[in-house]
Regions:
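Bacterial N-terminal signal peptides that target proteins for export
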Residues: 1-10
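N-terminal signal peptide c-region/cleavage motif recognized by signal peptidases
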Residues: 19-21
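Flexible, solvent-exposed loop/hinge segments and secondary-structure transition points
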Residues: 23-168
Length: 168
């Protein structure tokens, strides 16, 4: 009988833990990802748009983790354009901000200027986030056009080409 309060307390704790466990959410979750085919379609469309404008570029689509999913470099695009395109996509997805906007927000003596010194950050236009159903699912990076704005326009053309495949 002396252990009755202890046993009662143990039962209450066990019951509480069981109830909490029953209400706990799963330890996993589902995420949206671009298919490789959709990523390649966006890359091709951006490359074609830049070609029509007379630009030789590299284009990369990165997934939601910033890992390259699809990549193309046109014949005469400089060797630096490959890593720059990937890093523009990485910067856009990492900071959830298109790089043209990011470049303005981190320029000069702003409090965020130091972020430009982080590895892989490319604070010039040409990195644009890709969203589906309100969720960022990746980003496209373009490098090699004569201006950041031109890189950005080609990236947006790549996204426009896959718009029907994304949930908006």
């Amino acid at each position: 009988m002396r252990n009755l309060p202890l046993q009662t307390a143990a039962l209450l704790v066990a019951g509480t833990l069981t109830a909490v466990g029953a209400q706990a959410q799963s330890g996993t979750y589902a995420v949206k990802q671009l298919t490789p085919e959709t990523a390649v379609k966006a890359v091709r469309a951006a490359l074609e748009d830049c070609r029509k404008r007379g630009y030789q570029v590299a284009v990369a689509v990165v997934d939601r983790a910033g890992v390259a999913q699809a990549l193309m470099r046109d014949r005469f695009a400089g060797p630096h354009t490959v890593s720059t395109a990937i890093n523009k996509g990485w910067t856009a997805i990492s900071f959830r901000t298109d790089t043209l906007e990011f470049s303005k927000a981190t320029e000069g003596t702003s409090g965020s200027a130091g972020i430009r010194m982080m590895p892989n950050v490319v604070a010039v236009g040409g990195g644009v986030n890709i969203a589906s159903g309100g969720t960022t699912v990746g980003a496209i990076g373009v490098s090699g056009a004569p201006t950041s704005e031109a890189d950005d326009a080609c990236a947006k053309a790549g996204i426009a080409a896959i718009r029907d495949e994304l949930d908006f």
